[in-house]
Amino acid sequence: MNTALAQQIANEGGVEAWMIAQQHKSLLRFLTCGSVDDGKSTLIGRLLHDTRQIYEDQLSSLHNDSKRHGTQGEKLDLALLVDGLQAEREQGITIDVAYRYFSTEKRKFIIADTPGHEQYTRNMATGASTCELAILLIDARKGVLDQTRRHSFISTLLGIKHLVVAINKMDLVDYSEETFTHIREDYLTFAGQLPGNLDIRFVPLSALEGDNVASQSESMSWYSGPTLLEVLETVEIQRVVDAQPMRFPVQYVNRPNLDFRGYAGTLASGRVEVGQRVKALPSGVESNVARIVTFDGDREEAFAGEAITLVLTDEIDISRGDLLLAADEALPAVPSASVDVVWMAEQPLSPGQSYDIKIAGKKTRARVDGIRYPVDINNLTQREVENLPLNGIGLVDLTFDEPLVLDRYQQNPVTGGLIFIDRLSNVTVGAGMVHEPKNEAAVASSEFSAFELELNALVRRHFPHWGARDLLGDK
């Protein structure tokens, strides 16, 4: 058993008291990102090791694995704690997103270790979508690289406001203050172009040696700031969704018998209480909340992030994909939107293509009307292109098959975040963040020949069950 964990349980007065104490700790979700070989997995391993979160059998196994797969000579290869895939261990890299949990006396943490290689950028975006803070690793020998810029931009695009720039491998540059200062100024010059009001902090450290990770470094007396762990324990996280209006996407209509009809889902933002007047969209029908049902019994109110089932006083037509919100709020359904896209497929995203999209519990189709611009990661400039390639990031105009109720992603990630699904393979090919809902549908481009338009009209007339879209943009 983990001796540190056993000591904590003893101090709390038993397992039950310890578990209650854990429930009342705040939770911080963060990810490590940066270029390949910057030491992301090693840093997480060091955090787990120095906070004594490794079980004795894991430590013994780590000693054996370090001899077989390690890249640190006679030292423990802490990266092996999170690099679990055989291909990762053989190549000494991270491919998949690895999640780890640990806690200290002050806070609980969920870590997402994301890959640094450019071809795995889509994995990094997936890991960042649920996080509140990003640790950006920079190799002190190499400075700010393209992947550092790419991951910084994706993190801010996904709504992360807290960035900790961890300048790693300081032991390989003789713990030079000049090197740290130069990289800090270089990154701040780049960060001035990033969107949003960001909280950026810098920590010089050595994940391999443990300098400034969980304890102060004796080799960097010139640095008087907090350690990385102190930053993680004290950073103030304010969830945007808590202050936003109520949004409840219906995931499932629960009808176990004739006497019960509830609408199950996770409250995306705001709060809801018994007796509150709510409105179902897109129908616009109103009712009152009669009960809030949870696994632990009925509640009088619920808050953002909680999984609940709402029972209404009236029997109204609500199905999966509908949205419940406060009755006095106006949120019109829109036929189109401009969307920030991270493209994840080998086949480029091009104007005129149609995809299934899923947003909250709603699934429909969307047509790509145009690509306004992709973003050049090196300098965050915009340029004109014909398509968006694999790992490309850009602003895209979409028109939906049916009007959708949307929020801007920065206001509500649940009702403003969507995924693109290939209609043939059913594979997720892209992630989208609503930049701006639009009340007017874009006019489809006239790039189709007369034969294609006639064939399209013929198919829609005689085979309506195929669901073919009108190439001219009409339904």
UniProtKB/Swiss-Prot annotation:
Region of interest called G1, as start-end residue ranges on this chain: 34-41
E.C. number: 2.7.7.4
Keywords: ATP-binding, GTP-binding, Nucleotide-binding, Nucleotidyltransferase, Transferase
Keyword Nucleotide-binding found: yes
Claim: ATP-binding is one of the keywords in the record: yes
Molecular-function GO terms, alphabetical: ATP binding; GTP binding; GTPase activity; sulfate adenylyltransferase (ATP) activity
Region annotated G3, chain positions: 113-116
Binding annotation for GTP: 34-41, 113-117, 168-171
Pathway of action: Sulfur metabolism; hydrogen sulfide biosynthesis; sulfite from sulfate: step 1/3
Family under the similarity heading: Belongs to the TRAFAC class translation factor GTPase superfamily. Classic translation factor GTPase family. CysN/NodQ subfamily.
Quaternary data: Heterodimer composed of CysD, the smaller subunit, and CysN.
Function: With CysD forms the ATP sulfurylase (ATPS) that catalyzes the adenylation of sulfate producing adenosine 5'-phosphosulfate (APS) and diphosphate, the first enzymatic step in sulfur assimilation pathway. APS synthesis involves the formation of a high-energy phosphoric-sulfuric acid anhydride bond driven by GTP hydrolysis by CysN coupled to ATP hydrolysis by CysD.
Name of the featured protein: Sulfate adenylyltransferase subunit 1
